[in-house]
């Protein structure tokens, strides 16, 4: 009560001082202060105090998201040689045939509009660094990793090694495991999603293209059973194995293992097949529009975010481990990659236990 009286008294004193000043000026112009002006001033001060009380403090996650945004901008502003050195310092594994790096968030494999640094563009510089600056050194991309996805990326030192790795991937002999935080809990908690994916045009105020499901079965009109339909000629077979590792507060930590390599496959299967979009997936959380992901109030509260700030949430999809069969008679190669800090912070905020280290 005493604090409230002091605040009220201080407010009255400020108002009185303001009124006194107004009266001084008014006396020079022979006009009196208007009651409406005083009431308006009091109203504005009251609204300001209310806004101050309702202001949401910046959470550790939001701070990390801001840092991540700045880091992404810095990666695109540095000289390519500096960028290449940063990638080399992030290397996870290296031998005479391949090098595995930890791909940063928001870095594309190939040049796109408005992006200065990409993995492909810096390969010549990175090759020289890995080969003690010898002229003619080369590195080759072995597989795809989306711009917003972090984690293990395999590069080959020769064309022969690149072709070998690509052949292994195409023949489904390479084990790739991802970790994702999903909005929602997949049911059942584990299984295999075998639904082809096709690119579709989205019409409306924001026309664009997205990958979509192209099921091989449809529900009968009477609701009794399903009927197999002919596969669309432009659809791609897409198979994903998934397992929920833990869940709480309406969110889940899910391990994903793609058995095929279709564009946006994991994101499409989670969002459209299981209706559990990946946290930070602003593309597939809505179908008919391009807009920031809308999160439940409980999730926002745990993450320490407001809905207007979700547009800055990164995609929480991480390439955690790749296992390559032995090259030329050597033993299998297992490359693991630690989670990025923003991913760990999100798990902590959601009170989801961190996965065991591999």
Curated annotation (Swiss-Prot):
GO terms for molecular function: RNA binding; tRNA pseudouridine synthase activity. Transmembrane segments: none annotated. It is found in: Mitochondrion matrix; Nucleus; Cytoplasm. It is an enzyme of class 5 (isomerase). InterPro entries: PsdUridine_synth_cat_dom_sf (IPR020103), PsdUridine_synth_RsuA/RluA (IPR006145), RluA_PseudoU_synthase (IPR050188). GO terms for biological process: mRNA processing; pseudouridine synthesis; RNA splicing; rRNA processing; tRNA processing. Its EC number is 5.4.99.-. It comes from the Eukaryota. Keywords: Cytoplasm, Isomerase, Mitochondrion, mRNA processing, mRNA splicing, Nucleus, rRNA processing, Transit peptide, tRNA processing. It catalyses: uridine in 5S rRNA = pseudouridine in 5S rRNA; a uridine in tRNA = a pseudouridine in tRNA; a uridine in mRNA = a pseudouridine in mRNA. It holds the Pfam family PseudoU_synth_2. Catalyzes uridine to pseudouridine isomerization (pseudouridylation) of different mitochondrial RNA substrates. Acts on position 1397 in 16S mitochondrial ribosomal RNA (16S mt-rRNA). This modification is required for the assembly of 16S mt-rRNA into a functional mitochondrial ribosome. Acts on position 39 in mitochondrial tRNA(Phe). Also catalyzes pseudouridylation of mRNAs in nucleus: acts as a regulator of pre-mRNA splicing by mediating pseudouridylation of pre-mRNAs at locations associated with alternatively spliced regions. This is Pseudouridylate synthase RPUSD4, mitochondrial. The gene is rpusd4.
């Amino acid at each position: 009560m005493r604090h409230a009286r002091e605040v009220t008294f201080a407010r009255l004193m400020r108002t009185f001082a303001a009124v006194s000043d107004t009266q001084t000026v008014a006396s020079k112009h022979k006009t009196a202060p208007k009651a409406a002006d005083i009431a308006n001033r009091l109203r504005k001060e009251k609204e300001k105090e209310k806004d101050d009380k309702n202001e949401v403090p910046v959470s550790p996650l939001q701070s990390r998201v801001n840092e991540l945004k700045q880091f992404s901008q810095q990666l695109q502003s540095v000289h390519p040689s500096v960028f290449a050195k940063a990638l080399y310092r992030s290397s996870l594994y290296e031998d005479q045939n391949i090098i595995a790096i930890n791909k940063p968030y928001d870095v594309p494999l190939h040049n796109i509009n408005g992006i200065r640094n990409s993995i492909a563009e810096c390969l010549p510089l990175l090759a020289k660094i890995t080969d003690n600056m010898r002229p003619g050194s080369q590195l080759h991309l072995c597989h795809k990793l989306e711009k917003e996805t972090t984690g293990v990326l395999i590069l080959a030192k020769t064309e022969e090694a690149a072709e070998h790795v690509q052949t292994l991937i195409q023949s489904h002999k390479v084990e790739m495991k991802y970790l994702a935080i999903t909005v929602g809990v997949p049911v059942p908690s584990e299984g295999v999603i075998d639904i082809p994916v096709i690119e579709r045009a989205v019409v409306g105020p924001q026309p664009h293209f997205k990958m979509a499901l192209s099921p091989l079965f449809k529900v009968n009109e009477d609701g009794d059973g399903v009927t197999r339909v002919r596969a669309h000629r432009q659809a791609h077979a897409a198979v994903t194995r998934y397992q929920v590792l833990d869940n709480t507060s309406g969110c889940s930590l899910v391990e994903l293992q793609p058995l095929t390599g279709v564009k946006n496959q994991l994101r499409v299967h989670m969002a459209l097949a299981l209706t559990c979009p990946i946290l930070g997936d602003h593309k597939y959380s809505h179908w008919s529009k391009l807009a920031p992901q809308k999160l439940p109030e409980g999730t926002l509260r745990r993450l320490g975010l407001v809905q207007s700030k979700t547009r800055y949430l990164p995609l929480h999809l991480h390439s955690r481990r790749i296992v390559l069969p032995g090259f030329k008679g050597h033993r299998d190669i297992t490359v693991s990659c630690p989670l990025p800090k923003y991913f760990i912070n999100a798990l902590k905020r959601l009170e989801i236990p961190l996965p065991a280290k591999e």
